[in-house]
């Protein structure tokens, strides 16, 4: 669909010069917040985005995709991004990285800016708070990672399967008093689904569940390990490698050497520092490859949005 307005029209309606509109479109400095808001309001009102030909004339790539991670320091998300980038480069796309910090408001702002720049597509690392309404305009050119949504392409991890694999391995090793360190249920995947899988295994095998759900941070793992270590506990399952790193530090300080740790992640850091920990690989690298491939196929009209589930494997 052709834009009814040009950059010149937006400049006139906003009462600014064309160069100012260009700075706003490119998210450049040198524009006051008040002016930026005025220009963005006009663009939003008229549904404006720059044409591909206009971008090409400014020397910008005609093939751009965005990757919106939740945290730039996330070990798991970085593993997925590492396989996405080569896939995009190979097909001639220039990826740009953005961070949501688990904020739906930030995601909305990022998507608004990306729409105005008329980029080709988005890989969005999902989290609780991302609604279908928020991402609705991107249905044909967005892939959710680690979350799913009706009608949208998604690449998800087998959260229940990952915990079941760990619990089964520990059970086969003779452990019957297995505690769990996880994430609050407000996080549907890493939190609720993994905790529910732990509880389901305990119920099936008549084990007594002992769990704490502090959060995602390493420090939270460290601070809450004591609350799930009973006198008869022989193993501790952690919902993430980050929690396992915190738990391991606590166990070392307390000189507890007989307790078996297990975690979901199999990140390079955990394997290097603690090769003794039983880990499950949820397929972060494969998820990155699949997400990039799915987005490229959608951009080129070769497939419709679909849900992909990456199987977990014992590392």
From Swiss-Prot:
Disulfide bond positions: none
Domain HTH lacI-type, chain residue ranges per copy: 5-59
Q: Please list the GO terms describing molecular function.
A: DNA-binding transcription factor activity; transcription cis-regulatory region binding
Single Gene Ontology BP annotation: regulation of DNA-templated transcription
Keyword annotations: DNA-binding, Repressor, Transcription, Transcription regulation
User: Which amino acid positions bind alpha,alpha-trehalose 6-phosphate, per UniProt?
Assistant: 71-77, 126, 147, 187-190, 194, 242, 284
Please give the DNA-binding region boundaries.
7-26
Induction conditions:
Probably induced by trehalose-6-phosphate.
Matching entries from Pfam families are given as: LacI (PF00356), Peripla_BP_3 (PF13377)
Q: How is this protein organized at the quaternary level?
A: Homodimer.
**Task of the protein:** Repressor of the treBC operon. It is able to bind trehalose-6-phosphate.
Q: Which PANTHER family match?
A: HTH-TYPE TRANSCRIPTIONAL REGULATOR TRER (PTHR30146:SF146), LACI-RELATED TRANSCRIPTIONAL REPRESSOR (PTHR30146)
Q: Under which name does UniProt file this protein?
A: HTH-type transcriptional regulator TreR
């Amino acid at each position: 669909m052709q834009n009814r307005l040009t950059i010149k029209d937006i400049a006139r309606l906003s009462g600014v010069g064309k160069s100012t509109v260009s700075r706003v479109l490119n998210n450049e400095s040198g524009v006051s917040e008040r002016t930026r808001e005025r220009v963005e309001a006009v663009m939003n009102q008229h549904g404006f985005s720059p044409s591909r030909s206009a971008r090409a004339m400014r020397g910008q790539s005609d093939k751009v995709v965005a990757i919106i991670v939740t945290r730039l320091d996330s070990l798991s998300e970085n593993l997925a991004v590492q396989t996405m980038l080569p896939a995009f480069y190979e097909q001639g796309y220039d990826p740009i990285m953005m961070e949501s910090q688990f904020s739906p408001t930030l995601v909305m702002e990022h998507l608004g800016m990306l729409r105005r720049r008329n980029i080709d597509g988005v890989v969005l690392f999902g989290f609780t708070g991302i609604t279908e309404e928020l991402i609705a305009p991107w249905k044909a050119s967005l892939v959710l990672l680690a979350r799913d949504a009706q009608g949208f392409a998604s690449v998800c991890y087998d959260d229940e399967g990952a915990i079941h694999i760990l619990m089964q391995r520990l059970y086969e090793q003779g452990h019957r008093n297995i505690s769990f360190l996880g994430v609050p249920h407000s996080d549907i995947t890493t939190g609720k689904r993994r905790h529910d899988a732990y509880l389901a295994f305990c119920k099936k095998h008549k084990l007594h569940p002992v769990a704490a759900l502090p959060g995602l941070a390493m420090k939270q793992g460290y601070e809450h390990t004591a609350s799930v270590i009973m006198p008869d506990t022989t193993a501790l399952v952690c919902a993430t490698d980050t929690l396992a790193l915190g738990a391991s530090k606590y166990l070392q300080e307390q000189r507890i050497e007989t307790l078996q740790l297990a975690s979901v992640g199999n990140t390079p850091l955990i394997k290097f520092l603690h090769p003794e920990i039983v880990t499950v690989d949820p397929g972060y690298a494969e998820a990155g490859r699949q997400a990039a491939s799915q987005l490229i196929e959608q951009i080129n009209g070769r497939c419709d949005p679909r849900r992909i589930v990456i199987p977990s494997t014992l590392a």
